[in-house]
Amino acid sequence: MYAAIRQGKAKAGQAEELARRIKEGAIPIISDVPGFMGYYVVYAPDDTVVAISLFNNFAAAEESNKRALAWIEQDLAPLLVGPATAMA
């Protein structure tokens, strides 16, 4: 099992909205990647939001980060303090 992890810092008070939009927008994009196994979104009191995707191979995890970061940059930038980061 392989994990793709993306993290972003929401603007003050926007973490719940950011998490909601991630669940609604990213899951359809990520779940379409072959090898997808699961998806989780968590947020911390400091407005950090972390999305974790699980895959059955490393290439799928990397592909999901590529797709997710493109979507985040296009659709979530107004809610973020700086760019999101990703690792697989």
What are the roles of these predicted feature ranges?
Residues M1-V50, L54-A70, A77-A88:
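Short S/T/G/P-rich N-terminal loop/turn motif that feeds into the first structured element of a domain
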